[in-house]
Amino acid sequence: MDDTVLDDIIKKLVSAKNGRTTKQVHLTEADIRQLCTSAKEIFLSQPNLLELEAPIKICGDVHGQFSDLLRLFEYGGYPPEANYLFLGDYVDRGKQSIETICLLLAYKIKYKENFFLLRGNHECASINRIYGFYDECKRRYNVRLWKTFTDCFNCLPVAALVDEKILCMHGGLSPELKNLDQIRNIARPIDVPDHGLLCDLLWADPDKDLEGWGENDRGVSFTFGADKVVEFLEHHDLDLICRAHQVVEDGYEFFAKRKLVTVFSAPNYCGEFDNAGAMMSVDDSLTCSFQILKSSDKKGKVGFGNNSSRPGTPPHKGGKN
């Protein structure tokens, strides 16, 4: 993709910030198609289980909350100032899914060795057909463009390993996951199936009231207890599982005695939850700290916080995402 065109797209998107809101950015359909095609080639050229190095900043669900994505970058540093890993769910629910995914794809193309995107359960045609992305594409462009995004999403990697110690994915563990080569060997492009390893990596949830595996209230995949987290980490000589997929009040929440963390990066999710958003910073020594993007309060103030020593709390089962 032409560097000048790419830089122009990034500049347009980043400069959309208008006080506390972001204005709609109209990119040409041709430019968006080019973003999808170029990003797809890069996704397929890199492994399905990315092997990354710290320092890196890890972000959870963004869900079309474009102004909050820009706030994350303002706080963490716009690429290439920092390395980033996003854990999926870029589209649906929020008002600006197109701007959100286009900026993320543009950064992936420009900084392919420093900026990484995993697949979430909403990067799937059968889900984003229902929860807003299809309608946004159809209203602002056309259904063909939605199909182009689908082709791109079907090539996204599904997990990442940071310094061989922190395993990251959107959803969680799978009863089918015995070794990490199984993730490396998932063929792409692929649609998300209704069950099995790929489905679980994108859909599973931890459950503090459970031992072993349980039924998931979502009607898809499983829930897993702290025992399964400990067993998996010990077997693979890992320190931590980092995942997203659930709204948590403080933007991050520990589980299984700090062996698993949920990171959620869309504050005031859907305008319905009063949650904060968080970004997890992993430094060279693999120490994790959390930068908090507070939900704007009634007076419209925006707050930031930094916390690296919160006591662990189990994932909250309220909001589903």
UniProtKB/Swiss-Prot annotation:
The keyword Ligase does not apply. InterPro entries: Calcineurin-like_PHP_ApaH (IPR004843), Metallo-depent_PP-like (IPR029052), PP1_catalytic_subunit (IPR050341), Ser/Thr-sp_prot-phosphatase (IPR006186), STPPase_N (IPR031675). It holds the Pfam family Metallophos. Mn(2+) 2 binds at residues 89, 121, 170, 245. It is an enzyme of class 3 (hydrolase). Mn(2+) 1 binds at residues 61, 63, 89. CDD domains: MPP_PP1_PPKL. Its EC number is 3.1.3.16. The active site is at residue 122. SUPFAM superfamilies: Metallo-dependent phosphatases. One of its GO terms (cellular component) is nucleus. Binds 2 manganese ions per subunit. GO terms for molecular function: metal ion binding; protein serine/threonine phosphatase activity. SMART domains: PP2Ac (SM00156). Its cofactor is Mn(2+). Belongs to the PPP phosphatase family. PP-1 subfamily. This is Serine/threonine-protein phosphatase PP1. It comes from Medicago sativa subsp. varia. The lineage of its organism: Eukaryota, Viridiplantae, Streptophyta, Embryophyta, Tracheophyta. The gene is PP1.
